[in-house]
Every structure is written in C-alpha cells, then in structure tokens.
Amino acid sequence: FEGLEETVQELDRKQVPVYFTIDLDCLDPSVFPGTGTPEAGGVSFLELLAAIRKVSELNIVGADVNELAPMLDPSGVSTATACKVVRELLLAVAK
C-alpha cells in the first residue's frame, strides 16, 4: 500500500473523522477468489491486516467491507477470509 504511511500521518495531523472502506478485491485471487473483479498480483491477507491496523490509528467513524461474491467461490475460503477481515477491522477500531 504505497503512500499509506504518509496518508495516515496527514489525516492524523488534521484530526479529521475517517470513513474506512475495504474492497476485498484488492486481495490476490490466490487468497480471495470469490470476487467479481479479481486483482492479479493483489495484496496478501497479512498485508491487508497490516494496513487495517495502520488506518485504525485514525479517528474511524464508520467502515464497510465490500466485494465478496460467495457464489464465485464454492470452497468458502473467500467468505472465511471476509469474516476474518471484518473481525480484525472491528478489533482494531475498538481499541
């Protein structure tokens, strides 16, 4: 996530409320095949978790998680991954 550190620092300096959207199609299809818009060469699950933890340092006032298409992943791995992302987001924001 190029530029994330600088963006978080700037938003923190301004002390503005932040709405945080996570589009799960940023994940590599090897990790998250259940999306209508797969991103070859996307980020890993651990990279996304690190980004969530970084952004959660801000004044998060709301959030959403998008782009899960469970019918495109009969294995259920994408749904499990999405649930883990939501859990980590809630834990990070509730700190």
Kindly give the residue locations of the regions a language model identified.
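Catalytic cores of soluble, metal-dependent hydrolases
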Residues: F1-K95
